[in-house]
Amino acid sequence: MNKTLIINAHPKVDDTSSVSIKVFNHFLESYTELIPNNETIEQINLYDDVVPMIDKTVLSAWEEQGNGQQLTDEEQKVTERMSEILQQFKSANTYVIVLPLHNFNIPSKLKDYMDNIMIARETFKYTETGSVGLLKDGRRMLVIQASGSIYTNDDWYTDVEYSHKYLKAMFNFLGIEDYQIVRAQGTAVLDPNEVLQNAYKEVKEAASRLANK
């Protein structure tokens, strides 16, 4: 059975004035109408839920786990939460990430989230010939991203749009090769309504593709 995981990386989790949230809501409305009633949709809100970052506590916990040492209560709590996030991610086979573009890159909490799911022997493994993704079982990824500028004109802005490059490369690395991005771009320089309508059309098509695959 298909399970869809929504990864909301917008700092204003349910801000209805947010362009990326508007586009996501349009997607979700179409998607839920198309999928069977028994399919599961889960959502993690990265700025509301606890998403551990790699800090002193996490590094110490990893070192102690490697040495077979007992963890402190704080270390135990944080590693258990990281495991929960990882298992939730692995249990899904369709993913939708919602984010605004922040200074040409992903929001900081999304980077923290990536550090929770990119775990050796869980989502990738090391081999003599290099790293290999372990999620090569037909999983699908849709990224919904809003930005004030336009990043597809093959100019300077295209070169420095690191969020899309990073996400696509990392999920391909994990084995998720069915990757699509829908951009609501140019909100600061184009007619905002036109930007929204174009994005609505794209996410509706994406919803149909994901629901029927």
UniProtKB/Swiss-Prot annotation:
It is an enzyme of class 1 (oxidoreductase). The keyword Oxidoreductase applies. Disulfide bonds: none annotated. It holds the Pfam family Flavodoxin_2. Its EC number is 1.6.5.-, 1.7.1.17. Homodimer. This is FMN-dependent NADH:quinone oxidoreductase 1. It comes from Bacillus cereus (strain ATCC 10987 / NRS 248). The gene is azoR1.
